[in-house]
Amino acid sequence: MAEKTLEEMREAVEEIRAKMAAAAREAGRDPAAVQLCAACKTRTADIVAASAALPIDVFGENHVQELCANFDAGAYCGKPSHFIGHLQTNKIKKVLGRASLIQSVDSEHLLAAIEKEAAKAGIVQNVLLEVNIGGEESKTGVSPDRLWPLLDAAAAQEHIRVKGLMAIPPVNNDDAQNRRYLAQVYKLFVQAGERGYQNVAMETLSMGMSGDFENAIREGATLVRIGTAIYGERDYSKKA
């Protein structure tokens, strides 16, 4: 499947929105409480700008270079942009001011670096803490038991506000197992909110992608990150 035309993207987003709404209602939730984040990794600014006319709530970027290029080109057309990939400390400065939310904070080292750059810029940066719920070595994210020390560290920062959690459960063809992972993340989300940390407001639970976003919504996600189902297969030859 190649990259989609605008009309194909429109049809895809309509179908995704319908599935999102159905999953929310099935769980007794308001469909309006779940945001659609378009993961636009490797897409050109023209494609991103065209998709901005669709009912997409926010754009998510995995690479700092692409965030900068699309933001500076005005490709998001006024819609929020989030950073959802692994963030290197030497690139934080470029993300601040371009990403309204950094979804992938997974260490005290990264927290401290964001705090330092945000203080220099005179801003408060919103972040999510990323949880590696499956304990996979191939993925970033903090283990569930290390979430609490990370929250302690985040609460002490003056220029960071934690707005929730992000997770990528293991790819699993077992629907029940997938939902168990998602439910575990939701439990952490609720527990974190109940602990009353300073500078922490558990508002956003980012989980669910093209293959499992309906399950994620059933298990409490407030934001789902979808790329391939919107844009088609990625053409990595277009990016260095």
Regions found by a protein language model. Give the residues of each.
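Conserved alpha/beta-domain cores
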Residues: 1-187, 191-211, 219, 231-233
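Gly/Pro- and small hydrophobic-enriched strand-loop and loop-to-helix capping segments
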Residues: 221-239
